[in-house]
Amino acid sequence: MMFGKKIIHSKTIWFYFLLFLFSIFTNMGLGNVLSENIPVSDYAILFVITAISFYFTPWLGRILITVLFLSALFYCSAGFFYGIPSLGIIASVYETNINETLEYYTTIPFWIFLFQASYFILFVALMKLSFHVKQQAFKWLNTAVISLLLVFSYNQFSDWNYGYKFRFYPVLFYSEFDRMNDLYLEQRDFLNQSANAPSQWDIQSFMPKYKNYILIIGESMRKDYMSLYGFPLKTTPFLERVKGTVFENYYSAAPNTQPSLQLTLYRAEKGETVYTDNIISLAKKAGVKTYWISNQGKIGEFDTIASRIGQSADETIFMKPLGYNSKKVYDDEMLPVLDKALKENISNSKLIVIHLIGSHPAFCERLPYEVKNYFINQSMSCYLESIKYTDQFLEKLNSQLVAQNEPYSVIYFSDHGLAHYEDSNGLSLHPNNLYKQDYEIPFIMFSSDSQKVEKIKTPQSAFNFVYGFADWMGIKEKHLQGVDFFHPEKQEIKVFDWNNVVNVKELADDPAKLPETVQ
């Protein structure tokens, strides 16, 4: 009889030990891992909640840990890198198609899968043990454990009066997920409503200098891996020799595509986006024929900020219709589409926006040829090669414009940068919000009448791009006064880090890696 009680006692101890391990794994999977100083109570409070649920009825406990397990299992690949849910993460959930999702999983470090496997084994063991622990055991141990842990967890509850941002995990995860989801849906509804609404643009004059205006939106290109900006390997030979204007200190508005392009391509008023007023609606208001050529995909019901603007253009060409196409489409395949747009015989000026897939992870998938490992590893070699490929694309595009024999001007910028991280294959890059280099991007303008290279050293922000766009197009508009984009004044550069607008100087540094020959 005593032997049987010892077995029950042993199983009870093991159950609570595994339950505490489960609370640690769950907190980590739900994004509570990025803090520099995570108190024990962050893990203990979840242990308290689950223990209480088993105290009332084991079935309630099993349901609770199952919900927590599934949430953390599926979120951990984002949670380890980005923390609690943000607007950028929610937008990615809605706006990522199946092909992009599969590509995303190929970039996940192997240790994430090891974590998921360990977490799954822990969950199964915990569930099995829960059927062998008597409810009386739950009661006597809960009384002692919960009393002790509530003391350690007091600081969690003390934050409740400060709104949604109390640090009570996992409630914080679900409350933030719900809040960000509502915010995203609200913004999406605004965009849908504004699609057919009249713009607020008030154009005072329009004096175009060129026949063809080409705006090229790049993807995930850090400027410090471009030889144009001093990287020792030749990654941008065309951009280095073309005459035009180069911003040496240009910053994206945000660290990933959706918020970055929203803050770049739309007009803002008192810090709020005016969803009817974007670069396409401005050009159309001026009588310019507009084209949108995209290799990013038209996602369908939950299409991106960029594709919504694109669909409002006079001519819209998505290389990946409806956003799901397993066939790889390379950026070069847009050049024949561009040629057709250039040859369309109209009297008005044209605005042709080209949205590249560029250097989007996974980098090797963006290239129509195999890449030898010549810089650190395969991933980093492909990243450099994707920059070369974009440079070659720009050179071919310029040749097409020259052959057209019409005045033209081209602007190229990237939507955001990337940050270094380590995976099972070594060093690579992915979107992040913690470093200056997540926002430090190239901006180049070259035209048919450019005579020299002009370098602008004064920092400029993509928050001001719409002012520069109007100036570039020769449009004088009532709301776009007071900012001389191409002759910037000294200013503090702010960026949106998914949660707040912060000074870029306050961010950490993540410099480019150099070849061994120049280290």
UniProtKB/Swiss-Prot annotation:
GO terms for cellular component: plasma membrane. The chain crosses the membrane at residues 13-33, 40-60, 63-83, 107-127, 137-157. Pfam families: Sulfatase (PF00884). GO terms for biological process: lipopolysaccharide core region biosynthetic process. Keywords: Cell membrane, Membrane, Transferase, Transmembrane, Transmembrane helix. Its main location: membrane. It is an enzyme of class 2 (transferase). It is a multi-pass membrane protein. Its EC number is 2.7.-.-. It is found in: Cell membrane. One of its GO terms (molecular function) is phosphotransferase activity, phosphate group as acceptor. Belongs to the phosphoethanolamine transferase family. This is Putative phosphoethanolamine transferase HI_1005.
